[in-house]
């Protein structure tokens, strides 16, 4: 269930506004909920929160080879717009990474408290929570299985288990990226389908 916020600020999308701690959005959104497949009209109370700390997941698929749920997160936006004293326009265009996560029950991916810096390959404290672009955090948050350039908007994820493609594609993931709108001053990216190999 996607979060209805960029960074859980006291004043949403307001320059310099601090993050709410703990973030109340995580009680009902920003995560994956599990419901019974044989019952209609279920409420939150009837579901189980499977994982948390995910800003907005659109692409997800069950990997039958590893018997695990994988998700593609749409990362946060506007680092420079909201924190111009910390992030340059170029940094804002390149951060944070879009991430592929392998989930287990109870997994925490860290949003809104952290974001993943795909250039440094580190979990960083979000500026809403005292981050300065250098401070690492998220000790209890899981690492992404893979990361991709910022703002590419991964909207589809499919593990290939068929027999039509060459064997090198077997059990790998196809990821459909919607494409970016906010990578200025850099060129926009995305608008493609990528293949992510999986060894095991």
Task: Please annotate each region the language model reported.
Residues 5-45, 54-56, 61-200:
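Beta-propeller domain segments
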Residues 2:
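A conserved catalytic-loop motif detector
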């Amino acid at each position: 269930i996607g979060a209805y916020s960029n960074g859980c600020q006291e004043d949403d999308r307001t320059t310099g506004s601090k993050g709410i701690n703990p973030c109340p959005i995580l009680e009902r959104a920003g995560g994956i909920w599990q419901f019974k497949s044989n019952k209609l009209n279920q409420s939150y109370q009837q579901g189980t929160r499977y994982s948390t700390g995910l800003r907005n997941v659109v692409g997800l698929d069950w990997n039958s080879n590893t018997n695990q749920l994988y998700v593609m997160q749409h990362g946060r936006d506007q680092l420079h717009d909201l924190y111009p004293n910390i992030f340059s326009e170029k940094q804002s265009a390149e951060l944070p990474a879009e991430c592929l996560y392998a989930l287990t029950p109870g997994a925490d991916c860290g949003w809104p408290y952290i974001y993943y810096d795909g250039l440094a390959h580190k979990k960083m404290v979000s500026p809403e929570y005292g981050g300065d672009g250098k401070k690492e955090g998220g000790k209890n948050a899981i690492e992404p299985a893979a990361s991709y350039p910022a703002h590419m908007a991964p909207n589809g994820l499919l593990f290939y288990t068929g027999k039509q493609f060459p064997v090198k594609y077997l059990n790998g993931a196809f990821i459909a990226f919607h494409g970016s709108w906010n990578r200025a001053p850099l060129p926009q990216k995305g608008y493609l389908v990528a293949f992510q190999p999986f060894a095991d």
